[in-house]
Amino acid sequence: MSACEKTLAGRVAVITGAGRGIGKAIALGFAQAGAHVVCAARTSAEIDQTVLEIEATGGSALAVQTDVTQIESVSELFKTATAHFGGIDILVINAGANYDRKTVECSDPEDWKRTLDINLFGAYYCAHAAIPYLKKRGAGKIITVGSGLGHRGYPEGAAYSCSKAGLWMLTRILAQELLPYKISVNELIPGSVHTTIDDEFTNGSPVNSMSDEWHKQPEDVVPLALFLAGQPEVGPTAQSFSLMRRDN
């Protein structure tokens, strides 16, 4: 599916973590596909740059500085998006972080809390705040950006793995709860992508990751995100779509 086909023409997409990496790539791809894109992140300079790049190619975008660990900030994000574009059709829950890179025995509880606050509670806050707006549209899409580590775990990465496992379960529960409202909820697993988080796990080198894995650029994730966002109302829900070559 090519972005130039304008498959998302007129739709409004809110994307968290849109200032860099996968979130930024999806924001640019959705804009090229005709969506009005609301770029959310903690760092305003980064999402301002994303918006500038979208507008430079004739796209429509809005930057909203957001801290996904604060429910008030998340609520304001969706109020602002709706006031500006008239509603919300798509939510991409992408904001993520990893502050714990030690064994459970040696880990810092505060690092665990910070990781789960962003990856799991942040996802819950976004879904909780977005659902009323999606219902008003009569249908919608929620895409959670998960991780293979949430399905199989990773030594010295317990907090991140547990947060993504929780996100996958949240995805499945949301899909069941929102099925009557024609709101589909699916997980997108990018696999190994050259981003800050991936580099933390591999020390910046694919040699330290799975040798036969496909080491992607953020842009390589966009086609799958477009596919999920463009599915019909009766399309798949409660599913996990992965770009990994293997699951262990």
Could you tell me what each predicted segment is?
Residues 147:
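Residue(s) in the substrate-gating loop at a strand-loop-helix junction
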Residues 12, 19-21:
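Conserved glycine-rich cofactor-binding loop
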Residues 132, 176-177:
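Alpha-helical segment proximal to the catalytic Tyr-Lys
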Residues 127, 163:
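Active-site helix of classical SDR
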